């Protein structure tokens, strides 16, 4: 188990570094003589036609609606595995991170609403600071090396998992356009076939992908965000191969997708969405209630919500601190959870459709994430060093 966790954290750390480089590259290109090339790249028309079916979108939409569906598919696979055999399979293990995640989503939203209450047209962005980017958060935590207790890493991952569940529900419930009942019906008709494949222990991925693609197209046309098709499809991938119990179709697929998602899809998403032109930008734009509310939600709301819920649950006797940790370290993790980059950018696109005249929500996302990441790293670096000196050691998962 220790080796699996170590491999996972190393993978996420590397992915976080590549993600950061892609975001930096996007900002450099967007503020260089290559700006026009960047704009033409993300807005280049891409048309796919199969018979009478025509899907015409620009590259930006194909990345956000198409490639990100693969990311959400991987998220769905991870959620299913964690619920069946992982950290979420034991109710005693999930109370604290679940409560922390709820607090860490409600408080940032309230902070954002407080800054934008007098502007109803801006309230659509309330969910932007509610998200946590696990790749960046784990990447930052991994910079501290072996001093970090594995229980603290697991706590952070568990919060991020519940955060993903919350983000998926938010997108499904609050960021949908006018619904097409016919498209929803077609998407719904795929579910019995997927269920039948699962019950018959079909382990080949091709039949699932066939119905998954049909469902994705139907959901795309329905008004619900198409990436949710990826989550739904993941729930039907079998965890166990009854003919070969040593191999898990779900875990094999999860392993195969990790590299593609971490080192191709997410960096491409970051490159296509983080290209903020700073020409003409100043404190006035940064202090606009939308980006400022997002930054405050990520930095202030996240830590307040997570710490308040964690403290309340522990004081109520419903849970205890993760082994080998203390409240200072939990506070450091709450700061890292303010790194909302990927999912925040994604929800921002749904809420405002990109850059809006007079403000750019991405400024708040990047500023809030940077401040949260640096503050979390500095605090954990100091507290873990202090705790190591007083004899607190990392949890040994090999026992």
UniProtKB/Swiss-Prot annotation:
Pfam families attached to this UniProt entry: Na_H_antiport_1 (PF06965)
Taxonomy, superkingdom: Bacteria
Reactions catalysed according to its record: Na(+)(in) + 2 H(+)(out) = Na(+)(out) + 2 H(+)(in)
One BP term from GO: regulation of pH
Topology of the protein relative to the lipid bilayer: Multi-pass membrane protein
Segments crossing the lipid bilayer: 14-34, 59-79, 94-114, 123-143, 154-174, 177-197, 204-224, 261-281, 294-314, 335-355, 359-379
Keywords, comma-separated and alphabetical: Antiport, Cell inner membrane, Cell membrane, Ion transport, Membrane, Sodium, Sodium transport, Transmembrane, Transmembrane helix, Transport
Compartments where located: Cell inner membrane
InterPro entries reported in the protein's UniProt record: Na/H_antiporter_dom_sf, NhaA
Entry GO terms, CC: plasma membrane
GO MF annotation, one: sodium:proton antiporter activity
Record-linked NCBIfam families: NhaA, PRK09560.1, PRK09561.1
Membership in a protein family: Belongs to the NhaA Na(+)/H(+) (TC 2.A.33) antiporter family.
Stated role: Na(+)/H(+) antiporter that extrudes sodium in exchange for external protons.
HAMAP family with a match to the protein in the record: NhaA
Protein name, UniProt field: Na(+)/H(+) antiporter NhaA
Species: Psychrobacter sp. (strain PRwf-1)
